[in-house]
Amino acid sequence: MSTGPGLGYHIVDSGGSALPGSLQTNRRLSQWLRFRPDGIVEVSSGKVEIGQGILTAVAQIVADELDVDLARIRMVPATTAASPNEGVTSGSLSVEQSGSALRWASAEARAIFLDAAAQRLGVDAQSLEVRDGEIAGPGNLRTSYWELAEHETGGGLLDRDATARIAPKPATARRLAGVAAERLDIPDKVFGRPR
């Protein structure tokens, strides 16, 4: 079911098609996204900010797909040991590769959280709405990404491989991607802070 912003998700029949971008070779959702108890979403990309604006662009993409405020997104600096292996950083191609991978990973993460919320609240997932990571259902039922992540035992809700079954939102439902935003990398550069 495809719905407006903040509602539902869209399951696609990919016909066995490959996952987009770097998600093909880095399928583990928990390698890309982590939900911290303090209400922050940590996002890992294998691309390095070298002035092309990838940190800001990717943060906007993730915030759109998850229906969270851009201020909740924390981009984790790329490291060889912990980041998805996305090969080289090459200018605007980085947004195409990492951005598409994170768009699909975030869309699937959102659907996973909506399914978990539906089970926890005892309602149909399609009746739930997400606003800034808070999930609301009929009769004022509420939970959040962070509450669900905190109550998950073991490896967590995202400790699984991406499937390409959940399509990202259509461009018309995006509110942040493609809109000018303050660059996340500029303050560190201005104040000489290492990232």
Question: What kind of region is each of these model predictions?
Answer:
Residues M1-R195:
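Cofactor-binding beta-sheet edge motifs in enzyme active sites
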